[in-house]
Amino acid sequence: MAADASQLDRLFEVIAARKGADAGSSYTAKLLAKGVPACAQKLGEEAVETVIAAVSGDGGGVVSESADLLYHWLVLMAASNTDPADVYAELERREGRSGLTEKAARGER
């Protein structure tokens, strides 16, 4: 099986199926049971670990931590009842636009 973005969709389906499951049955169910703040904190921790690996020049660490980061992002999406497809649509909307133009349209500096 080739690796591609559809893996994220499949993983999200598994994560979403764990919502409301017994927290003792899986790590994902345990995270989801803790709520959005705990899921957001874990995502932040994984983001920092990814940055540390990148700054350290640890390519393998970047790959591993990025996988953790994406997993925890999907957990947060499920916890906050946000469909990743909405994020994909927003990325598609922004595609081809200058980052500076996009920021100006949002009133950012």
UniProtKB/Swiss-Prot annotation:
- What protein family is recorded? Belongs to the PRA-PH family.
Query: What are its E.C. numbers?
Result: 3.6.1.31
Reactions accelerated catalytically: 1-(5-phospho-beta-D-ribosyl)-ATP + H2O = 1-(5-phospho-beta-D-ribosyl)-5'-AMP + diphosphate + H(+)
List the GO molecular function terms.
ATP binding; phosphoribosyl-ATP diphosphatase activity
Broadest EC class assigned to this enzyme:
hydrolase
Any one annotated GO CC term: cytoplasm
Q: What is this protein called?
A: Phosphoribosyl-ATP pyrophosphatase
Q: Pathway of this protein?
A: Amino-acid biosynthesis; L-histidine biosynthesis; L-histidine from 5-phospho-alpha-D-ribose 1-diphosphate: step 2/9
Subcellular localization, per the record? Answer: Cytoplasm
**By which gene is this protein encoded?**
hisE
InterPro entries linked to this entry: HisE (IPR008179), PRib-ATP_PPHydrolase-like (IPR021130)
Q: Which terms are listed as keywords in the entry?
A: Amino-acid biosynthesis, ATP-binding, Cytoplasm, Histidine biosynthesis, Hydrolase, Nucleotide-binding
User: What biological processes does GO assign it?
Assistant: L-histidine biosynthetic process
